[in-house]
Regions:
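N-terminal secretory signal peptides that target proteins for export/translocation
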Residues: 1-17
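A structural motif detector for short, solvent-exposed N-terminal "entry" segments of globular domains
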Residues: 123-162
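Boundary regions of SH3-family modules and the immediately adjacent low-complexity/disordered segments
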Residues: 43-50, 109-137
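Beta-loop motif signature
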Residues: 43-98
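Signal peptide processing junction and immediate N-terminal pro/mature segment
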Residues: 35-43
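Exported/periplasmic cell-wall-interacting domains
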Residues: 112, 125-134, 162-173, 178, ...
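Bacterial N-terminal signal peptides
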Residues: 22-36
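SH3/SH3-like beta-barrel superfamily modules
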Residues: 83-125
């Protein structure tokens, strides 16, 4: 289990990773600074995807517990800024509890290991958001579907993880969207997700973090299972996707380099 999100990987350490996938679907929730992902078996584009997903943005560091009380075991410590770009940390909300003594709690999805990690955080020091964007990745068909408010917007062909390093299945979210330097593989953009490789505990100095990114400097045949677990898209497709997610260039003022999704 990854107990803290304080230590972030460099852009290269996760973006160069590749995921090998077994049969399944990866579904991503698209938050202001990320998307949500889910993996599961399917023969075609899902006919129904949830229209919206509630989110919460952190204003300061929060402790996530296994149940809605501070005496419960600590699951993770979440910083208010993402590790690579310094964007606002935004987490999908999957439950609520009014608690005792007036303390309100939120059950949220968390990044890191094990995949599917969740925890309870206090609602204080947060603000609410909502997203209508979802990404669904079918690793068997090697296809990516993009939904907005439950309606299919785009279908992309992808490179997914090879059998020895499969793309993990499950529900995840995009933590941050990164402009990749020309000298780094995986450009021109990379979406860092909350998922981690089930095979690689680390990769190129990073935590085996799964990304959705381009093929610059990497190649790979679209529609093939050839990566170490990450999902690679054609340049035009990752450009389109990145334009609908918050984007920040590492080392720059995130406010001056940020774009928000178009509706």
């Amino acid at each position: 289990m990854q107990s803290s999100s304080k230590t972030g990987a460099s852009r290269r350490s996760w973006s160069a990773c590749r995921i090998h996938a077994t049969l399944g679907l990866l579904t991503l929730i698209c938050a202001w600074s990320g998307l949500t992902a889910v993996s599961a078996a399917a023969a075609s584009a899902p006919s129904h995807v949830k229209a919206t997903q509630p989110l919460v943005a952190l204003l300061y560091e929060h402790s996530a517990y296994s149940s809605p009380r501070t005496s419960a075991p600590l699951v993770a410590s979440m910083w208010p800024k993402t590790p690579i770009t310094g964007e606002q940390t935004t987490l999908p909300v999957i439950g609520k509890d009014n608690g005792r003594g007036g303390t309100r709690w939120l059950k949220v999805m968390l990044p890191g290991r094990p995949n599917g990690l969740t925890g309870w955080i206090e609602q204080g020091g947060t603000y609410s958001l909502v997203t209508g964007w979802h990404i669904v990745v079918n690793t068997s068909l090697r296809r990516v579907w993009i939904y907005f408010h439950g309606r299919l917007q785009r279908t992309f062909e992808a490179v997914v993880g090879k059998p020895s390093t499969p793309t993990p299945s499950g529900n995840f979210f995009v933590q941050e969207t990164i402009i990749m330097p020309a000298s780094e593989p995986g450009g021109p953009f990379a979406l860092a997700t909350s998922a981690r490789s089930d095979v690689l505990q680390d990769f190129d100095g990073g935590p085996g973090q799964i990304g959705i990114h381009g093929r610059d400097g990497l190649g790979g045949t679209l529609g093939a299972a050839q990566s170490h677990g990450c999902v690679r898209l054609a340049t035009a497709d990752i450009d389109w996707l990145a334009a609908r997610s918050r984007v920040s260039s590492s080392g720059a003022d995130p406010l001056s380099t940020t774009t928000r999704c178009c509706t």
